[in-house]
Structure formats: structure tokens, C-alpha cells
Amino acid sequence: MTITKRKNTFYTSQFISYMKGYYLHPDIRGNLVAFTSDDDVWLMTLEDMKPIRVTSGQGVAIRPKISPDGKKIAYTIIWLRKGKGGGDIFITGNGETKRITFFGSMNTRVLGWLSDDEILVLTDFHTPFPQWSETYKININDGTMEKIPFGPISNIAISGDIIVIARGYQDLPFWKGYKGGTKGEFLISYDKGNT
């Protein structure tokens, strides 16, 4: 069997003709795809593959997540002003942008949506060290926060009753043979984290 490398395997030629650049942090919900490029959030449908810029000039946008109803996008904006950096969560939908957090922490990002009104956020806000991040559930309507007792995590995936937590997975890719205590691991719960 011969394996040949093809340029741009994951994109249709139609998509490439519209945009050339660096594409990061994709998220998909139904037929919608959100991603970042040129420090902004972009959105497109799988039918027409024509990206539309959703944000502009707010700072560096990262990790967009589309709401379950497909009407909102949560994302992190990172900025650097007068030698100090920060990051917070914003929601864009129905032509409006709303700032959800006021943490000012570079290590703040959206993990995903729990419902159309609640997001999961990972942040080092209220922790003694920037490497120590905790998970919060935030209501996007009234801003109420609830700390979720998952302990230290790097990422999370939720589907129905199943929760997969990733810990320590940012290790450098060339550490493949590393067998020490900080290698990444997945923890899986089949009952919404009750066990």
C-alpha cells in the first residue's frame, strides 16, 4: 500500500479559495463551524464554506465554542496592554457581544457549553499559581459562578452522562517515552461525574 501526502487534505478547494491563513481551535455544532484565524473568530456553514468574521479588533481571540442552539459563540479574548496581559470570556450572538468574566487572567478559556445559558470555564483566577487552573460553571445571563470540584484539569469533554477529563496533557510532544508523574491521563465517568 502506498501512502501519498496531499496538500490541504482537510479543506475543500472551495474553502481554500476564500481564505488562506492559520486556522486554529475549530468547534463544530450541527452544520456550523467556528474557528480562529488572524486573531479573530470566524463562522461558516458546511454547506457554503464561506467564512464570516465574527469578531474584530478586540484582542487575540482563542478557542471559540458554539452554543447548543447554534445562536451564540463563547470565546476567550487575550490582550496585552502596558506590559501586562489578561484574558476574559466573551459571548457573541444576535449581533451583540457581551463580556462574561472580569478575571483578567491569561489562563482563562471556555471549555464548552452545558446548556444555552451555561458555560464551563477553566481559569487560574483565585488560585495562587498560574499553572493551577480550576473549573467553573458560569451562567451567561446573570454572571453567577459555581466552582466545579473536578480538581486540576487541562480539558473536558461532555456528552450526555459521559464526562472525560484530561489532566496534564500539555506535555511536550517529544516526551513520548516519558514515564514520570506528570504525563497526561484521561479520567472517564459514565454517570455525570458522580463516581
UniProtKB/Swiss-Prot annotation:
SUPFAM superfamilies in the record: Tricorn protease N-terminal domain
Superkingdom in the source lineage: Archaea
Principal location class: cytoplasm
Record Gene3D superfamilies: Tricorn protease N-terminal domain
Enzyme Commission identifier(s): 3.4.21.-
One term of GO molecular function: serine-type peptidase activity
GO biological process: proteolysis
InterPro entries noted in UniProt: Tricorn_protease
Keyword Cytoplasm attached: yes
Statement: the UniProt record of this protein carries the keyword Hydrolase: yes
Gene Ontology cellular-component annotations: cytoplasm
Family the entry assigns: Belongs to the peptidase S41B family.
Protein name: Putative Tricorn-like protease N-terminal subunit
Organism: Sulfurisphaera tokodaii (strain DSM 16993 / JCM 10545 / NBRC 100140 / 7)
